[in-house]
Design a protein with these regions (language model features):
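Juxtamembrane helix-capping/reentrant segments at transmembrane boundaries
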Residues: 31-45, 89-107, 171-178, 254
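C-terminal ends of transmembrane helices
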Residues: 22-33, 79-85
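A basic- and aromatic-enriched beta-loop-alpha substructure that forms the phosphate/nucleotide-
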Residues: 62-100
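Select subsegments of transmembrane alpha-helices in polytopic membrane proteins
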Residues: 39, 103-115, 182-189
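Hydrophobic transmembrane alpha-helices
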Residues: 5-21, 44-75, 118-158, 163-267, ...
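Transmembrane helix irregularities
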Residues: 30-31, 75, 109, 181
Length: 286
């Protein structure tokens, strides 16, 4: 089993992620400086993708494209979050963690798991010796990534511009994409990582299909744990007594995801619903 894990760079990327996140944990714990937290997460994705591509050395077109996708996403998001927190001056998520080393450690452990798990599709593709011809599913995955990337970037900039305006102080963002969804940035992030998974499927074989854990983990994380629930609670505390906000919340979708899940379910049923394909998906090793 160790050979199988190492041949897919799973142990290697786990060690790299643990070391990288531990470094920033030490900085945060000793200096009480938490402004690099999101930057540490975003750049860790880039490091994993780049290292696995270079170490394997195959340089297949599909590997290069997916690595570039991760790099472009990580650079944009990492710099955006870093500049934003430097402007705002504090990260309220850590208000109760700065003096509690145990809770702070749990956060960084969870971030390491997040990075490693979500990176699984790219990690396995970059570790693979298989290089099938480009297929329609590759293009579909690239389109999903592009749409998700544009949506996330646009939503981030729209909200940042909204909050910078003194006229909008004390208001919730309801312009641009935020007029149609309460969390369009998270929709974009979920979509682009599902796109990366879809584009990785031509390479996957047997137990490698378990990399679907990556986008599933991200989706559940943002929907039910650390993403949307925290922001919804914060907004409810700030604007819960405002009639306009209650109307906005009632009329505006949380996230445009159900239609995407339905379409992906159709695709998945056509590609892995046969007995042989499902058996490959459920195999733990091959």
């Amino acid at each position: 089993m160790g050979t199988i894990i190492d041949s897919h760079f799973l142990a290697f990327t786990a060690l790299v992620t643990i070391a990288y996140q531990f470094l920033f944990f030490v900085v945060t714990a000793l200096l009480k400086f938490d402004k690099v937290t999101d930057f540490a997460g975003s750049t860790n994705f880039i490091i994993i993708a780049a290292l696995t591509l270079v170490i394997k050395g195959s340089w297949y077109f599909r590997q290069i494209i997916l690595t570039l996708f991760v790099g472009i996403w990580g650079i944009r998001l990492g710099l955006f979050l870093l500049f934003r927190i430097l402007q705002w001056g504090e990260d309220r998520r850590f208000d109760e963690m700065r003096s509690n080393l145990g809770r702070l450690a749990i956060f960084w452990i969870f971030q390491a798991v997040w990075v490693w798990a979500v990176s699984l599709p790219v990690t396995v593709v970059n570790a693979s010796d298989r290089n099938p011809f480009l297929q329609v599913v590759d293009i579909v995955g690239w389109i999903l990534w592009a749409v998700g990337f544009i949506v996330e970037g646009t939503a981030d900039q729209q909200k940042l511009h909204f909050k910078r305006s003194s006229e909008n102080r004390g208001k919730w963002c309801n312009v641009g994409l935020w007029k149609y969804s309460r969390h369009p940035n998270y929709f974009g992030e979920i979509l682009l990582w599902w796109g990366i998974f879809v584009a990785s499927t031509p390479v996957l074989k047997g137990a490698e299909w378990l990399v679907i854990i990556g986008p599933i983990f991200l989706t559940l994380l943002l929907l039910f744990v650390s993403g949307i629930p925290l922001l919804e609670d914060s907004a409810d505390k700030k604007f819960g007594n405002v009639d306009g906000y209650r109307i906005y919340k009632k009329r505006t979708r949380l996230i445009y995801l159900l239609n995407v899940i339905y379409l992906f379910g159709l695709w998945l049923s056509r590609n892995v619903s046969s007995p042989s394909a499902m058996s490959r998906l459920l195999l733990f090793c091959h």
